[in-house]
Every structure is written in C-alpha cells, then in structure tokens.
C-alpha cells in the first residue's frame, strides 16, 4: 500500500481505479493471546523486516506516544524514510539512546554504542524493558531527549574547536559520545530529577559546567589507565567502560 501511495504521489495524473490489492482478513475472536502479533511477525516478509519494526506494537510505546502527543510532541515509533527530527519531534531510536544515557547503567550505554539493534532483539525483556517499561512516562522521555540534545550540541561545538580531526581529544569526543552523555547525566542526577514527573530543563550553564568537568575526568582516566588503547574499540568494551565510569563517578 505504501508503494502505491508513493507512486501516486510521483504520478498524480495516473488513474488508480483499476488497481487490485490482495487482502486477507484473520478472525482473532477466539485466538490465543498474542496470536495477532505473531501472525504479523510471520507475514511481514515482503520487505526487509527488523526487530525495530515491531516496536510500534509495544503497548508501552503506544502509551508513551499518546502521553507525548498531549505535550505537543510527535513521537515516531514506526520506522520511516521520511522522518525528520525537530524541536517537537523525535523517534524511538533517539529516545532509546537518551534513556540509556540517563539510566546510570554503563553496560546499557556500551551496548548502545556497539549498536542499538541488539537491544531490539528482545522486546519482552532485557535492556529494552529496562528502558521502556510502565514506570517510564512520556514527560520523562521528553526530558531526557532534550537534555541529550543539549549535551550533543555542546559536544559538537567542542569537536569543531579542534584544529584536527584526529588525535586523542578528537577520538574521545567522537567515540566517547555516549560515555560523555552518561557521565554528564549522572553528574546532573538527571534520572532522579526527571523521575519527579514534572517537565524540567537544566540551565545551559549548568550542563556546560558538568560537561567540561566530565570530559576532563574522562581524558585523565583514559590517559592514566588506557593510553595505549584504540578508543573506537574501548568505548564498545563493557568491562573497560564500566571501570572508567565507576572510577570517574567515585570522584564526583
């Protein structure tokens, strides 16, 4: 159906009156629990299907989407080629990354750095349910996304100040993007602040201050303990990242 829609949009003068679309209706009245979801999974094979595509069927995602809509936020839970983020729009991937960085759980953040696809592999448990569960409100999701965007803006500005796109400083800012966000949010105690259930935004000056402190501590810790490590690999290593995170947080 989406293909037909795209064709019509590109060829508005073409008549679609004679098009036939095969349709199958399955009665679920006496079907087992979750049978409809399983049928959907088994039959969606006409295009490349990823676990991420079934997030839109998660009741928690639908609830969060509804709560965000009441806040004037468009939360996209379906994968779309035309999606574009804005001040009032974000998708489930951005929400997942932001929630991970706010979680205080370095193992989750390391997995996100390695690839969010692994988290979508188990939509019934694991890290996915740690991030998206009945206790996570739409307001909370919106707050962590906005804070993560602030952190990213500062990080991008710091990266642009560097005279070279190489070296330890550059590698730390680029490869350590998720670790930096985790450290900043932990330093701000964002999870506890946002968990109060109210819309809150940290002042830019406070975020910038904690960012600078976190980046400095991260550089010092890496220089002291992992000077010979390749940063691209280090920030995907859960054991090393947990050691770095715990060492830094012990000084905060």
Residue ranges and their predicted role:
Residues 2-17:
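Short active-site loop/helix that positions an aromatic residue
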Residues 15-29, 52-56, 205-209, 213:
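A generic structural motif
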Residues 25-193:
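C-terminal catalytic or substrate-handling cores of phosphate/nucleotide-
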Residues 175-252:
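C-terminal accessory/interaction regions of large nucleic acid-associated machines
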């Amino acid at each position: 159906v989406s293909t037909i829609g795209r064709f019509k949009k590109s060829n508005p003068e073409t008549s679609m009156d004679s098009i036939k679309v095969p349709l199958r209706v399955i009665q679920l009245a006496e079907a087992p629990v979750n049978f409809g979801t399983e049928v959907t999974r088994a039959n969606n094979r006409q295009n490349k299907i990823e676990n991420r595509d079934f997030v839109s069927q998660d009741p928690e995602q639908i609830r969060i989407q509804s709560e965000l809509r009441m806040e004037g936020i468009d939360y996209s839970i379906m994968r779309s080629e035309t999606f574009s983020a804005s001040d009032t729009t974000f998708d489930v991937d951005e929400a997942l990354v932001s929630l991970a960085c706010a979680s205080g759980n370095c193992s989750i953040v390391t997995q996100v750095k390695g690839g969010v696809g692994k988290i979508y592999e188990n939509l019934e448990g694991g890290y996915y349910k740690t991030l998206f569960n009945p206790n996570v409100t739409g307001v909370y999701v919106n707050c962590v996304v906005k804070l993560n965007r602030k952190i990213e803006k500062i990080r991008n500005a710091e990266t642009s100040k560097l005279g070279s796109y190489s070296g330890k400083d550059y590698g730390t800012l680029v490869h350590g993007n998720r670790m930096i966000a985790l450290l900043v949010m932990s330093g701000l105690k964002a999870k506890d602040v946002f968990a109060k259930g109210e819309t809150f935004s940290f002042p830019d000056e406070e975020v910038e201050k904690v960012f600078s402190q976190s980046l400095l501590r991260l550089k010092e810790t890496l220089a002291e303990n992992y000077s010979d490590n390749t940063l691209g690999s280090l920030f995907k290593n859960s054991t090393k990242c947990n050691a770095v995170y715990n060492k830094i947080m012990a000084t905060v």
